[in-house]
Amino acid sequence: MAARLVAELVKEGVIKSERVKNAMLKVPREEFVTPEYRMMAYEDRPLPLFAGATISAPHMVAMMCELIEPRPGMKILEVGTGSGYHAAVCAEAIERQGKVYTVEIVRELAIFAAQNLERLGYLGVVEVYRGDGRRGLERHAPFDAVLVTAAASEIPKALVEQLREGGVMVIPVEEGVGQVLYKVVKSGGKVKRQAVTYVLFVPLREG
């Protein structure tokens, strides 16, 4: 099932690198969905979790992962843990060499994600925190990459500050016409942002 989905994403040009391809093959998406959706785990669509959250569609996880150009040794911040699937894919994409810090505002989701990641052996590479991800995680900054999995009204200043020079942020932002996924590169203390595609994410919560 995973192999067929990944082959399709490679064919469509969503997956471009061996690292992301291997990561998508290794992480069992069915372990990160609620029981009633296990049979749909390898459909290329978002699925409901609980507390108003969703697990992103596989093509979106792959696309966002490709945009940060993963490599061993990276330190990644994820804002919006959900069930932990995206963090696990990032961990595999950096070959479990480095660190993924992920912040979830909903307590029940943070617990659910931590349980999933622990069961599958990711704790140690992935650390789950409960809190307002818009504020980042200053104690572990700077980050090589920041991934935001919910739509922000604007790019949070704290996340830019916690991005290292040359680092990349991938973030969906609410625009007048809808949501746009941006690749943001920090250079010379300033940010350059490039629109990637229109997207549809749940809103980034405040807390």
Swiss-Prot record:
* UniProt entry keywords in alphabetical sequence: Cytoplasm, Methyltransferase, S-adenosyl-L-methionine, Transferase
- The record's EC number reads 2.1.1.77
Which Cys pairs are S-S linked? Answer: none
User: Which enzyme type, at the first EC level?
Assistant: transferase
Q: Where in the cell is it found?
A: Cytoplasm
Residue positions of the active site: S56
Chief subcellular location equals: cytoplasm
Gene Ontology CC, one term: cytoplasm
User: Which processes are annotated in GO (biological process)?
Assistant: methylation; protein modification process; protein repair
InterPro entries, per this entry? Answer: PCMT (IPR000682), SAM-dependent_MTases_sf (IPR029063)
What domain of life does the native source organism fall in?
Answer: Archaea
Which is a Pfam family this sequence falls into? PCMT
Q: Which reaction does it catalyse?
A: [protein]-L-isoaspartate + S-adenosyl-L-methionine = [protein]-L-isoaspartate alpha-methyl ester + S-adenosyl-L-homocysteine
Any GO MF annotation of the entry: protein-L-isoaspartate (D-aspartate) O-methyltransferase activity
Q: List, alphabetically, the HAMAP family matched.
A: PIMT
| Similarity comment text for this entry | Belongs to the methyltransferase superfamily. L-isoaspartyl/D-aspartyl protein methyltransferase family.
Cite the NCBIfam families for this sequence. Answer: pimt, PRK00312.1
| Protein purpose | Catalyzes the methyl esterification of L-isoaspartyl residues in peptides and proteins that result from spontaneous decomposition of normal L-aspartyl and L-asparaginyl residues. It plays a role in the repair and/or degradation of damaged proteins.
Its protein name is Protein-L-isoaspartate O-methyltransferase
**Could you tell me which species this protein originates from?**
Pyrobaculum calidifontis (strain DSM 21063 / JCM 11548 / VA1)
The root-end lineage is: Archaea, Thermoproteota, Thermoprotei, Thermoproteales, Thermoproteaceae
Gene name, per UniProt, is: pcm
